[in-house]
């Protein structure tokens, strides 16, 4: 583990990782459409060897293992031990002998070589040194091997994240200050030109980026959507940093922001906007 990545790794092995592990089913339900779009772009084939970067609770790793079949192999890697415990249990329950997991930092760990596909669903935006990380990942690929991942586009295109955060800040009388758009986090890969530069610098070619938007169902009521938002996403961090005593105020503010956006039956759906990125290792 590098010193630069230590903060991220500590978070994903603490309360954050435990919370995501506990909410695995709900989180997977919401992001599955994006993962499916990335899987279609990756087109894993029987017999292929795949590395799933930032595999989390193993949802995409299991799908990849199904696609490559008994003659293929999938390695899911993640820094979060709590989430990997869920992933391993799910792999056992699905009887996937071609699937394994390792608790390592993909940006620097020794990874299998001659891999056919490096894949990730929302797992590559947290690298502290993304240029170095993708140089390292390319070394694991065979000649003409593929790298395919999905990442969030800009916050302005993702109201699922910004509506709740804006409401929380207003409730606390906080004005958003300047921030580093490239800092490790959900939106670090929003800038398509920077993503292209990272991959090009790492030695990839045939770089393609496709926009994929999907309405995200955050909850069946404004209240349940607000409760979910305070567990996952940018507003959850803001709420924690504001202090436990302010959680009721923030929850009520987010609920009020979601209420006029609810559909007739109460469902709260807000747009999620992503890049599906693919590239090839020329050798």
Residue positions per predicted region:
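A generic alpha-to-beta junction signature in SAM-dependent methyltransferases
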Residues: 42-44, 68, 141
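Conserved class I S-adenosyl-L-methionine
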Residues: 1-48, 59-63, 83-86, 105
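Conserved Class I S-adenosyl-L-methionine
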Residues: 3-11, 19, 23-24, 28-31, ...
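A short acidic, Gly/Pro-enriched loop at the edge of an enzyme's catalytic core
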Residues: 107-118
């Amino acid at each position: 583990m590098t010193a630069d990545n230590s903060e991220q790794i500590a978070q994903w092995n603490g309360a954050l990782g435990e919370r995501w592990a506990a909410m695995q089913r709900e989180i997977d339900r919401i992001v599955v459409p994006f993962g499916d779009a990335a899987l279609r772009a990756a087109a894993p084939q029987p017999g292929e060897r795949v590395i799933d970067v930032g595999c989390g609770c193993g949802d995409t790793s299991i799908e990849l293992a199904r696609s490559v079949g008994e003659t293929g192999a999938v390695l899911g890697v993640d820094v979060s031990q709590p989430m990997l415990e869920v992933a391993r249990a799910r792999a056992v329950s699905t009887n996937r002998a071609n699937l394994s997991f390792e608790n390592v930092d993909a940006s620097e760990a020794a990874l299998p070589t001659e891999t056919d596909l490096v894949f990730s669903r929302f797992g590559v935006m947290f690298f502290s040194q993304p240029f170095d990380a993708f140089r390292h990942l390319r070394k694991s690929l065979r000649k003409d091997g593929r790298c395919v991942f999905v990442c969030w586009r800009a916050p302005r295109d993702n109201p699922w994240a910004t509506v709740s955060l804006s409401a929380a800040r207003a409730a606390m009388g906080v004005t958003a200050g300047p921030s580093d758009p490239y800092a490790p986090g959900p939106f670090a890969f929003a800038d398509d030109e920077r993503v292209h530069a990272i991959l090009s610098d790492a030695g990839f070619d045939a770089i393609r980026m496709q926009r994929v938007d999907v309405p995200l169902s955050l909850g069946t009521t404004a209240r349940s959507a607000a409760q979910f938002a305070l567990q996952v996403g940018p507003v959850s961090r803001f709420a924690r940093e504001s202090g436990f005593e302010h959680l009721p105020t923030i929850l009520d503010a987010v609920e009020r922001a979601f209420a006029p956006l609810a559909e007739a039956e109460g469902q709260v759906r807000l747009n999620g906007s992503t890049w599906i990125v693919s590239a090839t290792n020329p050798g």
